[in-house]
Amino acid sequence: MNREEQLGILESLLFAAGDAGLSTEQLTEVMEITHIEALNLLELLSERYNGSADRGLILLELAGTFQLATKKAHADYLRKLVEVPSNTVLSQASLETLAIIAYRQPVTRMEVDEVRGVQTDGPIRTLVAKGLVTDKGRVDGAGRAKLYVTTSEFLDAFGLNSLEDLPKLADPAAEEPDQNEMDLFFDRFNQSKEQEEE
């Protein structure tokens, strides 16, 4: 595999890792390269991102991990994107993530990841940007992960007065909402959206 292919793989891995980032140990294991090769690839990718005005991303090293981030010079545009009201429909991943947060709040991203079986950085960012979810403090102990809860906008969007109005789970001891409850949850969301459009 040549250097350009390795850089493409590295870029894909960093994108998929999201805010969690990747350590050089993770990169060496996944890419099957040495520690020195990983550092060289990271340096080369950093030079490409950080040294070019036509790139919108930079490579950051934070707390021993590497992650992609947007350039500070583009912050005003990103702020506008987040502030512009959007009537776009939530993706299936975002809806599933929202249901997990609604039923388990307060909950960490890692706990949501565990229930869904995949990383949920993107869906959580979308839900926060749309005002349906917010972080409410941090977990005590190592890592100090953010705790996510639903907002009053969530209640409004689903036509609920309080969280007690959420559809009840078939088995109160169940850890995950079953498919019928998830369908009911999404149906209520779609109905409220249709009413808004009328």
UniProtKB/Swiss-Prot annotation:
This is Segregation and condensation protein B. Belongs to the ScpB family. NCBIfam families: SMC-Scp complex subunit ScpB. GO terms for biological process: cell division; chromosome separation; DNA replication. It is found in: Cytoplasm. Its main location: cytoplasm. It comes from the Bacteria. Participates in chromosomal partition during cell division. May act via the formation of a condensin-like complex containing Smc and ScpA that pull DNA away from mid-cell into both cell halves. Homodimer. Homodimerization may be required to stabilize the binding of ScpA to the Smc head domains. Component of a cohesin-like complex composed of ScpA, ScpB and the Smc homodimer, in which ScpA and ScpB bind to the head domain of Smc. The presence of the three proteins is required for the association of the complex with DNA. SUPFAM superfamilies: Winged helix' DNA-binding domain (SSF46785). InterPro entries: ScpB_csome_segregation, WH-like_DNA-bd_sf, WH_DNA-bd_sf. It comes from Listeria monocytogenes serotype 4a (strain HCC23).
